[in-house]
């Protein structure tokens, strides 16, 4: 085997599905012995992760050594058991073990407790100033034991006292994800693992086929995929027998020649494969690298722009990659009042102060023994250390730093903001670590960090200084070594402190040489051979970052020390990064920050730099290309080390007089200085003695050398310089400065003063002239991250220097340090300059397709070399946002900045140039404007998703605009390579015609000509994880057709499966493969005799053979997601039920981990021949469904079908939460989502089609099933369910299926615990009794009863943005900051738990915030809450997303929809955070006091705003309604525009009254409107003063509700529109008269009168069936005829109300709509019920406010009743005999309705004019026949017609309006044509044919 995979030793796997199982431990690999039990371990939990590697290899990963646990406070253990650490923990554990055994099976030998230890942490529930000791008990072996143990502890079954458990309510899987920093749909990175045999010999790309032919063999070590987001090709490792390291394989393969030991033989079964995945392996929890990169910064020190919630950083980076601009959070307004001041106006602070003083006085006067004190943190003999995340965490915190280059260990040096620099000039002169080089700072920070780790536990453990306590949840050292460790820590503390002080003093002297500093700061590099390889290939990379200290680096524990990567950094090249142990800055987007520097290395480089210690001589940092330029390679700037003098501004006498501790504090303060992110302010540190600035200059001079471009360094100031590749740079001068890293501006708005044309050319050609086009980017990137990455900052310095400052000599250069800054000699233009340049006219100098296109931009390109000029002014405005002086600026989360320097235009590829030249041979005078050259970078996946908006295809868009403004739909080109468009203009017509044809077929209204066509499918969007390479998900859609008997639905007990349609698709592909498995026992020919196209067909003679083949095929494809519309009834559920009848273990066989009895480990294939099939599993057929549906919750809320390792999605139930519809049939959803009409064919017809054979209509049945399988994928893609759910999984940190199946508390808890654990908090786990017995919640939100009326004056709607989250942030409301109520403090309770507060904390009233409900909290200056910080980041992310939405163009409708979904998800998680605190019934950690505080603060804020508005005479406004977070303000006598002005004033004034971030926003203006009752209002809304057409906006009324029918909603909306526009109630009355007459005469569509309501059978009372809801009654009636028609839980069942007997109840008058639509139906729609009980009451609630009486209107209306069905001619008699007209002897005239004799058809009056009567009958019959034929044609075109024309249309879709019209016309035609035929006036017309 290969020793390594391209040097990589990291295995990465995407977490798609995760579960755990119990197994016996693997010797030497798992926990095999328990010291607590004193015996071997029998079973341990093993976590199983399913997913794909970045290369797409399906993998099953077993994680060992992860155990469930819980915590118990040591303070709650009874005192008699305090016999030291060992005694107390042992007694507790033994008692708990005994209780668990007694609770279970006493005779069982099952083990429960594995180990216990003492840890130290803070309680999260309530304010606790000190840490406490906890017993951490590992309940090994069975995770459900944790819940049982918690119940026993709370019940007092252990030690005879109720003990409060902590974190026992967290599920085992979530506990694992949180502890090891893992996220669903993110990657887990493993440092080492063991693969289980067999492994694939070669990598074969996954392909979907039904044969056994092997795929194409690929021998490469890595596969390359195009990444369209980074526009670069990314190489992913492939794991096969030839690439897996030998030590990474279990030595148990049959192919191995190594003899096995006896132990290995005995445990050989442990290493056998369990899964069917391509790869399978084992790893331990300690091998997970993700856990090492948590960020442990204290919240009190983290800046607002530092993302502590790591899952949100990816959203910020994606936006930066898309726009190139980093949108920093908006800082709070310093002029706004403080939280304490606002709370004083809400609360009775005088009474509160008196009560508090009285209580404190009583405490002081009480006897010493009675004085309440804080709960002791530990017993007298207990010694504990701060807890960290695992046993080696202390080593991780220090040791891991030594594994990586020093430049990656220490924090990136941030930059001070302009404001901060101006406000505090002295800070610029303060002696800080900015004056020292990075290597000295590295050593200082590392030493300081070691001092914290060693000394803090012994000395500062009880301090409340959050700067000192950064250590996080971890087990402690054994007791025997505690004293020794403390002694060593004390010694280390003294030595480290002395070394720190010496370093501080040394920093004021001359810097040591580079070699010595390197040896001290950098560890030995184990990968030096990789460095040598990279230097040989001349592909060393350098990485640029800022060099200014950041606030997050306080305590020396820099952010970069912990967070070396994130998933977004690793998703393209994570293996390469891990391989070299060089992790990029956490907040720096990978491959998208820097443009290439114009330098290359030649072979002479090796002469000056030895490859073995190149890292000691070169400061090299990686530079990645900007997305538009990533096809270029990376460049190196070699700089030799020289010594430099550093400013010495510290008085040595002052330093000498400081104590050791003072020096350390000074050191910490220097690190923790409040650095705000700096935009573009220069920071030049000058020598205080000489006032000079040390600066080194790197000057490049370019010379023309014939036609070729060349350049050379004419002056290289660093002495020995390698020969560099020549570069044409004109007069480009690059200043390299040590201290200056700012952009200086000197106005140069004249084009003549800017860079010359040659220098402009250089800037454009930097990325194309130094590296050949054909160079393999993979070669350049391989092995380059090994080098020591020294962060340098790039500066654009164009200050016009004079004298010594402008001249840079070699002597000055020799004194500079190793940290350098690259500076361009010519500054970019300012914004003013750019604006002026945009107005200049274009001047063409030469034919240059990338440079001179007047259609692309205006102005002189030499004026602005950094940016292309666009015509779109709006785009220019957006492009310059967040930039300073024209340079894109990226604000990192740590406060530092990155400057984005890219060429103005990306160069074309070689193929593009060659094709351009070849096409240009015919005409040498082609105008470049008419022949635009498009980029064709195949190697970087460049593409343009919108050709109409692409500036370099203007000739196309201009021509298209001339033809009906139709734009070119380029969605098909979005993921293909671009082409050069050099066709003559005549060809554009064809392109235009194709676009118009595609729009006609899209069934979507065409664009208005102002924007491109909106893509119909969401497949045009891919989220960051699936960009280019995809998320490696395989989705399989399954639909089934089975036989049916008569009108019954298929029953798996009796009916065989005939057709299985399989549609499989990878998420990175737009092409779905279709396969059909056909059971046809009569088929002799196995060929595709049905003539099906676009699919692969397999025919089977036996049903068992069909199932066997289906199982084999599914296991070969190994899909991640199984999808079906109705899983339980028509997809996998039906197959499982049928397989159970056949004796096949279907669900077990299709799982990824089947039972060993059905898996052949030798070839990993299923062997399910008929001889291996066991007897039927179910003896009683009635129990079949119970076998398939495993749990009740799954049946009612998900699919109910569980397949191990695969996600089963019930499509209709997912859509139910996405789209609001009356019915959720696939036909209704397809029309609403896809705008496609889909036929609904009854099972009886499908069976007839299939039975007709290949010569008949069997193909119609097969196509119908295939279409439904395809629709599943299309609907999911249209709604982007897979990608959106994946994104939510990454944000929430939970697995994919939990996003869909778990509630909001689970989501909040995942995000909350991750942040809480970084601050050393433990969450309480209350029991059900505790939750029920907590104090009742007293506060309710303010919901005013509105002044119900019609308002003809403007009504302003003002809304507090995210009111409850804003309250939490503004007033620091959190579990960890809550001090409780004074009244409750006497009872020592807080929420669900007991709480004793140290009253010394209450001494200072200024340090306490009291909310209006008298609950006390500490201000953020004392402690920053977890909830406020979490919500602050969520809201800032949402604001950023909403801003991005506003900047999108109309053609980016798909992206707009995704952004909208993203911001709604963030809004949801922010709003439900309050619900997490207030979940009083099923809450996992509720707190009544906290919930009441949030509600009452919000209520008080709203009440205060209402009073303020009503009391302000200037506005003359009055609040007429208020609801939780909004208020409606009436402005009498104002116009809409005036209302907007007043509304903005109100919003601004109230916003200024409240602390940050409470914001009142003006939403809209209603004019006019109705206010009905609470939460019910409707009106015409205006969202801007310039809006002309109002929007009909309603809430809570029938127009938006689904508990009524469409007739009510349509009638009400039209009536309201008439009244709003006409202001005349008579118009409404006339309209209603017309509608009522239509209803009474029957001239309506039945579709508008269908009710559809949810049915939950099994939840209703069984005492009286008449008490069931109408929909349930209809369902039960249907089930009596066919039990398989049982509706799914919460399925919406349609019904209509018909006429019944006199006095009949409503439950007796409801029927299925299909019953009423039947041609021979005896029923008639109950028109009076709909008018009197539905339409009139709804409208009366509205128009009653203006004095209308609709009941009186209806009574006064001339009553026109239609003739009964008995008076209408029918072809057949009333066979049902359910009406009295069956017994009538008389009939009615078919023309006038008069009574006639039984044998006559016409009355005497009509017979007097026979010709007129005959003409009338013929005309009516002909008209109906034409209508019927037209409707039937529509239905046949849709696919609803029968294969025999005479059989008519078989579709009966209730979602189709054509179906209702067709049935209505069919009834009329049937009766009239029979009479016309009998009268011999018209030929016979068969209505059944239609």
Curated annotation (Swiss-Prot):
GO terms for cellular component: nucleus; zeta DNA polymerase complex. Catalytic subunit of the error prone DNA polymerase zeta. Involved in damage-tolerance mechanisms through translesion DNA synthesis. Its cofactor is [4Fe-4S] cluster. The keyword Membrane does not apply. Zn(2+) binds at residues 1789, 1792, 1803, 1806. Residues 922-940 have a biased composition (Basic and acidic residues). Binds 1 [4Fe-4S] cluster. Keywords: 4Fe-4S, DNA damage, DNA repair, DNA replication, DNA-binding, DNA-directed DNA polymerase, Iron, Iron-sulfur, Metal-binding, Nucleotidyltransferase, Nucleus, Transferase, Zinc, Zinc-finger. Disruption phenotype: No visible phenotype under normal growth conditions, but mutant plants are hypersensitive to UV-B light and gamma rays. Residues 508-565, 922-942 are annotated as: Disordered. This is DNA polymerase zeta catalytic subunit. Residues 508-533, 549-560 have a biased composition (Polar residues). InterPro entries: DNA-dir_DNA_pol_B, DNA-dir_DNA_pol_B_CS, DNA-dir_DNA_pol_B_exonuc, DNA-dir_DNA_pol_B_multi_dom, DNA/RNA_pol_sf, DNA_pol_B_thumb, DNA_pol_palm_dom_sf, DPOD/Z_N. A zinc finger (CysA-type) spans 1789-1806. The CysB motif binds 1 4Fe-4S cluster and is required for the formation of polymerase complexes. Its EC number is 2.7.7.7. Forms DNA polymerase zeta with REV7. Belongs to the DNA polymerase type-B family. [4Fe-4S] cluster binds at residues 1835, 1838, 1851, 1856. GO terms for biological process: cellular response to UV-C; DNA damage response; DNA replication; translesion synthesis. GO terms for molecular function: 4 iron, 4 sulfur cluster binding; DNA binding; DNA-directed DNA polymerase activity; nucleotide binding; zinc ion binding. It is an enzyme of class 2 (transferase). Expressed in roots, leaves and flowers.
């Amino acid at each position: 085997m290969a020793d390594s995979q391209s040097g990589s030793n990291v295995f990465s796997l995407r977490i798609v599905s995760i579960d755990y199982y119990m197994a016996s431990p693997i010797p030497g690999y798992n926990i095999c012995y328990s010291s607590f039990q004193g015996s071997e371990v029998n079973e341990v939990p093993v976590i199983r992760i399913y997913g794909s590697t970045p290369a797409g290899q399906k993998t099953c990963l077993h994680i060992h050594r992860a155990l469930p646990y819980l915590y118990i406070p040591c303070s709650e253990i009874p005192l008699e058991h305090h016999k030291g650490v060992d005694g107390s923990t042992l007694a507790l554990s033994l008692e708990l073990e005994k209780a668990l055994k007694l609770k279970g099976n006493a005779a069982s030998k099952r083990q429960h407790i594995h180990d216990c230890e003492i840890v130290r942490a803070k309680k999260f529930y309530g304010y606790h100033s000190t840490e406490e000791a906890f017993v951490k008990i590992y309940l090994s072996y069975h995770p459900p034991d944790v819940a049982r143990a918690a119940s026993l502890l709370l019940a007092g079954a252990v030690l005879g006292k109720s003990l409060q458990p902590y974190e026992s309510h967290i599920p085992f899987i979530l506990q694992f994800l949180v502890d090891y920093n893992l996220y669903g749909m993110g990657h887990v990175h493993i440092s080492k693992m063991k693969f289980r045999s067999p492994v694939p010999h070669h990598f074969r790309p996954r392909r979907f086929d039904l044969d056994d032919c092997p795929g194409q063999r690929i021998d490469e070590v890595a596969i390359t995929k195009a990444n369209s987001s980074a526009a670069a090709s990314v190489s992913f490792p492939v794991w096969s027998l030839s690439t897996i390291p030998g030590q990474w394989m279990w030595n148990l393969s049959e192919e191995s020649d190594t003899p096995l030991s006896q132990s290995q033989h005995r445990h050989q079964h442990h290493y056998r494969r369990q899964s069917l995945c391509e790869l399978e392996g084992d790893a331990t929890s300690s091998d997970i690298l993700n856990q090492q990169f948590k960020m442990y910064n204290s919240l009190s020190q983290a800046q607002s722009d530092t993302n502590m919630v790591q899952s949100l950083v990816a959203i910020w980076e994606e936006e930066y990659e898309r726009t190139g601009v980093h949108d920093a959070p908006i800082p709070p307004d310093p002029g706004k009042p403080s939280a304490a001041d606002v709370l004083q106006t809400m609360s009775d602070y005088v009474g509160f102060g008196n009560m508090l003083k009285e209580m404190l006085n009583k405490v002081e006067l009480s006897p010493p023994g009675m004085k309440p004190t804080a709960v002791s943190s530990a017993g007298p003999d207990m010694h504990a250390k701060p807890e960290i995340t695992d046993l080696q965490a202390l080593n991780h915190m220090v040791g891991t730093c030594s594994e990586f280059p020093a430049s990656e260990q220490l924090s990136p040096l941030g930059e001070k903001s302009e404001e901060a620099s101006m406000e505090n000039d002295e800070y610029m002169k303060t002696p800080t670590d900015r004056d020292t080089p990075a290597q000295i700072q590295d050593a200082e920070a590392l030493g300081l960090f070691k001092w914290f780790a060693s000394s803090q536990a012994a000395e500062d453990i009880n301090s409340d200084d959050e700067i000192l306590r950064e250590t996080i949840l971890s087990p402690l050292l054994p007791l025997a070594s505690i004293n020794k460790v403390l002694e060593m820590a004390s010694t280390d503390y003294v030595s480290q402190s002395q070394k720190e002080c010496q370093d501080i003093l040394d920093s004021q002297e001359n810097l040591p040489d580079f070699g010595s500093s390197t040896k001290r700061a950098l560890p030995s590099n184990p990968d030096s051979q990789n460095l040598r390889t990279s230097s040989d290939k001349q592909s060393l990379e350098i990485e640029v970052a800022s060099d200014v200290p950041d606030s997050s680096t306080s305590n020396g524990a820099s952010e970069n020390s912990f967070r070396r990567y994130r998933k977004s950094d690793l998703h393209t090249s994570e293996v390469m990064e891990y391989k070299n142990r060089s992790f990029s800055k956490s907040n720096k987007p990978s491959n998208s920050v820097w443009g290439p520097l114009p330098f290359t290395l030649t072979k002479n480089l090796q002469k000056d730099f030895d490859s073995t210690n190149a890292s000691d001589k070169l400061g090299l940092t990686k530079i990645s290309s900007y997305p538009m330029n990533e096809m270029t390679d990376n460049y190196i700037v070699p700089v030799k080390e020289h010594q430099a003098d550093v400013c010495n501004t510290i008085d040595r006498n002052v330093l000498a007089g400081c104590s050791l501790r003072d020096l350390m504090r000074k050191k910490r303060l220097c690190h923790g200085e409040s650095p705000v992110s700096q935009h573009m302010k220069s920071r030049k540190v000058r020598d205080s003695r000489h006032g000079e600035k040390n600066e080194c200059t790197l000057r490049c001079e370019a010379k023309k050398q014939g036609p070729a471009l060349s350049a050379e360094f004419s002056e290289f100031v660093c002495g020995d310089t390698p020969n560099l590749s020549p570069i044409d740079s004109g007069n480009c001068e690059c200043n390299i400065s040590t201290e200056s890293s700012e952009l200086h501006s000197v106005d140069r708005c004249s084009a003549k003063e800017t860079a010359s044309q040659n220098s402009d050319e250089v800037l454009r050609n930097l990325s194309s002239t130094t590296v050949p086009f054909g160079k393999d980017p993979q070669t350049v990137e391989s092995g380059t991250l090994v080098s020591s990455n020294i962060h340098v900052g790039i500066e654009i310095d164009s200050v016009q220097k004079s004298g010594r400052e402008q001249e840079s000599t070699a002597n000055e250069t020799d004194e500079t340090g190793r940290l350098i800054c690259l500076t361009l000699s010519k500054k970019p233009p300012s914004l003013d300059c750019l604006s002026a340049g945009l107005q200049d006219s274009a001047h063409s100098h030469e034919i240059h397709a990338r440079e001179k296109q007047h259609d692309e931009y205006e102005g002189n390109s030499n004026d602005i070399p950094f940016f292309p000029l666009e015509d779109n002014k709006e785009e220019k405005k957006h492009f310059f946002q967040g930039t300073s002086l024209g340079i894109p600026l990226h604000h990192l989360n740590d406060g530092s900045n990155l400057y984005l320097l890219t060429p103005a235009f990306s160069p074309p590829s070689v193929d593009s140039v060659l094709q351009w030249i070849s096409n240009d041979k015919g005409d040498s005078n082609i105008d470049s404007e008419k022949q635009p050259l498009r980029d064709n970078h195949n190697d970087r996946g460049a593409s343009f998703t919108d050709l109409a908006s692409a500036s370099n295809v203007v000739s196309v868009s201009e021509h298209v605009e001339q033809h009906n403004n139709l734009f070119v739909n380029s969605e098909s080109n979005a993921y293909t390579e671009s082409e050069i468009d050099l066709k003559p203009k005549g060809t554009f017509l064809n392109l235009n015609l194709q676009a118009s044809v595609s729009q006609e077929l899209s069934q979507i209204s065409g664009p208005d000509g102002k924007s491109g066509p909106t893509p119909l499918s969401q497949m045009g969007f891919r989220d960051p994880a699936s960009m280019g390479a995809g998320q490696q998900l395989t989705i399989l859609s399954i639909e089934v057709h089975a036989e049916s008997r008569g009108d019954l639905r298929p029953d798996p007990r009796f009916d065989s499966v005939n057709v299985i349609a399989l549609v499989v698709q990878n998420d990175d592909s737009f092409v779905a493969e279709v396969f059909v498995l056909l059971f046809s026992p009569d088929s002799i020919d196995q060929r595709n005799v049905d003539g099906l196209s676009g699919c692969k067909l397999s025919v089977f003679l036996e049903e068992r053979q069909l199932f066997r083949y289906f199982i084999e095929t599914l296991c070969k494809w190994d899909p991640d997601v199984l999808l079906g519309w109705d899983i339980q009834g028509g997809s996998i559920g039906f197959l499982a039920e049928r397989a159970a009848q056949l004796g096949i273990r279907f669900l077990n066989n299709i799982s990824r981990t089947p039972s060993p009895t059905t898996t052949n480990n030798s070839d990993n294939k299923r062997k399910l021949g008929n001889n291996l099939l066991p007897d039927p599993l179910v003896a009683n057929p009635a129990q079949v469904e119970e076998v398939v549906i495993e749990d009740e919750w799954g049946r009612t809320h998900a699919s109910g079908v569980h397949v191990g390792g695969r996600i089963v999605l019930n499509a209709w139930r997912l859509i139910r939460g996405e789209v609001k519809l009356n019915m959720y049939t696939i036909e209704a959803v397809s029309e609403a989502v896809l705008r496609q009409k889909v036929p609904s064919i009854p099972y009886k017809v499908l069976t007839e089609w299939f039975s007709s054979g290949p010569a008949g209509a069997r193909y119609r049945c097969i196509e119908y099933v295939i279409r439904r399988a395809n629709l599943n994928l299309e609907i999911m893609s249209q709604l982007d369910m897979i990608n959106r759910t994946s994104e939510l999984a990454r944000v929430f940190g939970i697995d994919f299926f939990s996003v869909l199946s778990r509630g909001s508390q689970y989501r909040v808890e995942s995000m909350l615990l991750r942040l809480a654990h970084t601050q050393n908090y433990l969450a309480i786990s209350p029991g059900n009794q505790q939750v029920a017995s907590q104090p009742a919640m007293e506060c309710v939100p303010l919901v005013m009863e509105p002044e119900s009326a019609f308002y003809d004056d403007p009504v302003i709607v003002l809304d507090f943005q995210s009111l409850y989250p804003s309250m939490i942030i503004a007033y620091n409301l959190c579990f960890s900051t809550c001090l409780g109520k004074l009244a409750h403090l006497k009872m020592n309770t807080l929420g669900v738990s007991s709480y004793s507060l140290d009253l010394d904390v209450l001494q200072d009233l200024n340090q306490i915030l009291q909310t209006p409900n008298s609950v006390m909290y500490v201000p953020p200056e004392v402690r920053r809450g977890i909830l406020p910080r979490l919500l602050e980041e969520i809201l800032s992310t949402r604001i950023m997303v909403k801003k991005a939405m506003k900047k999108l163009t109309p053609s980016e409708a798909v992206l707009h929809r995704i952004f909208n979904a993203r911001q709604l998800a963030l809004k949801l998680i922010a709003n439900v955070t309050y619900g997490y605190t207030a979940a009083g019934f099923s809450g996992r950690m509720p707190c009544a006091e906290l919930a009441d505080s949030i509600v009452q603060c919000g209520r008080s804020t709203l009440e205060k705003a209402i009073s303020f508005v009503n009391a302000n005479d200037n506005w003359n406004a009055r609040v007429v309604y208020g609801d939780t977070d909004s208020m409606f303000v009436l402005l009498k006598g104002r116009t809409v525009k005036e209302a907007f002005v007043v509304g903005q004033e109100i919003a601004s004034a109230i916003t200024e009254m409240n602390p940050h971030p409470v914001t009142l926003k003006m939403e809209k203006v209603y004019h006019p409107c109705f206010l009905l009752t609470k939460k019910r209002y409707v009106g015409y809304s205006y969202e801007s003063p310039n809006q002309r057409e109002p929007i009909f906006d309603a809430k809570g009324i029938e127009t938006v509700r689904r508990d009524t029918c469409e007739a009510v909603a349509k009638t009400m909306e039209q009536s309201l529109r008439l009244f709003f526009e006409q202001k005349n109630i008579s118009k409404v009355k006339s309209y209603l008269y017309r509608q009522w007459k239509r209803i009474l005469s029957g001239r309506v569509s039945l579709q508008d009168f269908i009710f559809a309501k949810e049915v939950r059978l099994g939840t209703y009372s069984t005492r009286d069936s008449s008490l069931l809801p109408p929909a349930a009654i209809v369902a039960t009636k249907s089930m009596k005829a066919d039990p398989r028609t049982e509706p799914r839980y919460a399925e919406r069942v349609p019904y209509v109300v018909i006429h019944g007997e006199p006095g009949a109840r409503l439950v007796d008058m409801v029927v299925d709509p299909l019953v009423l639509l039947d041609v021979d139906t005896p029923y008639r729609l109950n028109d009076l019920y709909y008018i009197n009980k539905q339409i009139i009451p709804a409208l009366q609630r509205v128009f009653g406010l203006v004095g209308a009486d609709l009941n009186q209107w209806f009574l006064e209306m001339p009553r026109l009743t239609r003739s009964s069905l008995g008076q209408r001619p029918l072809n057949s008699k009333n066979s049902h005999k359910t009406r009295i007209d069956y017994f009538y002897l008389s009939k009615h005239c078919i023309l006038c309705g008069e009574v006639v004799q039984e044998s006559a058809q016409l009355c005497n009056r009509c017979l007097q004019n026979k010709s007129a009567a005959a003409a009338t009958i013929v005309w009516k019959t002909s008209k109906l026949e034409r209508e019927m034929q037209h409707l039937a044609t529509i239905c046949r075109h849709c696919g609803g017609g029968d294969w025999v024309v005479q059989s008519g249309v078989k579709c009966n879709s209730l979602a189709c309006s054509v179906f209702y019209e067709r049935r209505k016309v069919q009834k009329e035609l049937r009766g009239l044509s029979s009479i016309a035929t009998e009268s011999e006036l018209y030929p016979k017309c068969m209505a059944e044919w239609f």
